């Protein structure tokens, strides 16, 4: 419900987990969605997810809820978001963008985004994604890198 952008499809324990960013529209028609699983309507411009056994059957999708509120809920500017759920060394991490860079520049300019990463709690057997909080600090380093060896840019969060 309320699809806007930032779609991603993952597979967990044989089920399809579809994550997406919700729209700016009001939620007055929330009751018309029958497969909402007792969940409240998502907040405006938040990240939500749905689960299905058969992704090609539109009636098979079950709404599971919001897993990240709008960045404005965490002290950043209100705006749309894109996330990526990544499993690494047995843990899940949520990558997202925020306006932290824009705010720190204090130039009045807009549209500058920076990437953030926080740990996510995911139960693969039930396809439950816990609520994730965006932060300015992110996560601690997962392991140390050798400063005398060439390091690829994608290791910057390890």
Predicted stretch roles:
Residues 1-158:
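Carbohydrate-active catalytic/glycan-binding domains of CAZyme proteins
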């Amino acid at each position: 419900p309320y699809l806007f952008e930032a779609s991603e499809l993952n597979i967990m324990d044989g089920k399809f987990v579809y994550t997406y960013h919700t729209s700016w529209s009001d939620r007055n028609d929330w009751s018309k969605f029958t497969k909402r699983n007792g969940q409240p309507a998502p907040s405006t411009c938040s990240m939500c997810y749905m689960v299905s056994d058969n992704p090609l059957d539109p009636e098979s999708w079950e709404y599971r809820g919001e897993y990240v509120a709008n960045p404005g809920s965490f002290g950043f500017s209100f705006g749309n978001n894109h996330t990526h759920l990544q499993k690494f060394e047995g843990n899940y991490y949520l990558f997202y963008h925020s306006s932290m860079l824009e705010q720190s520049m204090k130039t009045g300019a807009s549209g500058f985004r920076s990437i953030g990463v926080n740990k996510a709690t995911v139960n693969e057997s039930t396809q439950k994604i816990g609520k994730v909080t965006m932060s300015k600090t992110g996560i601690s380093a997962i392991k140390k890198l050798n400063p005398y060896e060439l390091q690829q840019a994608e290791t910057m969060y390890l």
